[in-house]
């Protein structure tokens, strides 16, 4: 099990150009950054742009580039890609361009196995209802893909490689899990299926300067070899230490990242990507 990181572990600090900022050309290191959702961009892109201007070079910044409906929030060139009609694509392009010129450690976040559009167009790649009448749909109206399907692996890998070519340093495959339901057909070993899929995606996409990461629900998930991380969501500050203790991967202070909407200080000793909405709170506390 993983021991909590010591207090003297170097962590990248926002608004800090010093030695603890991330050098994207070197080894993976502990993360302390912000995430930007598509909803944030649609609601107030001016505020998003203002907030990122305050961040120093090499800050880890994550931006959502593809959602669970399957829509892309950028002009993907992939065959079959559905471009979001409710997203200001030129504004997103401007955001990504500014992330480049600011020299951020850039993370693209995509919904991976939860993908309504790809499921509709490629039914045999999805998880079927028990009746086999069609694909199983979750309460949000989304389809889920079968990680043992070759076309699922090819599709996800293609998206990752496109974002890699766009200059992202890391891609997070969100919802890299099975849905929590017994109303669909899957008779295999679910943890093994996910680990095999992760290995295949790593083989297709990884390099010595690029990180592929997996948004999982199980802290005991076994990461494949190579430059990769696991991200854990919906872990409240009171549970973060107990959750971290369940992790079995090597170098957990670097390879296990918590996604949090909160500025709570109990996340500080771990790798954490927080909502951009708490930047002011976190930075004011640091300045005290």
Task: Please tell me what each predicted stretch does.
Residues 60-65, 87-136:
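Glycine-rich, aromatic-flanked loop segments that form ligand/cofactor-binding clefts
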Residues 2-48, 52, 212-216, 231, ...:
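Boundary/entry segment of secreted carbohydrate-active catalytic domains
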Residues 137-222:
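Polysaccharide-binding and catalytic clefts of secreted carbohydrate-active enzymes
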Residues 44-72, 162-174, 227-231:
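Catalytic domains of carbohydrate-active enzymes, especially glycoside hydrolases
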Residues 22-41, 113-161:
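Active-site-adjacent "subsite" loops/lids of carbohydrate-active enzymes
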Residues 35, 105-115, 172-173, 191-234, ...:
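Aromatic-lined carbohydrate-recognition surfaces of secreted/lumenal glycan-active proteins
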Residues 5-18, 69-111, 181-209:
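Aromatic-lined substrate-binding rim segments of carbohydrate-active enzymes
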Residues 227-288:
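Substrate-binding cleft of secreted/luminal carbohydrate-active enzymes
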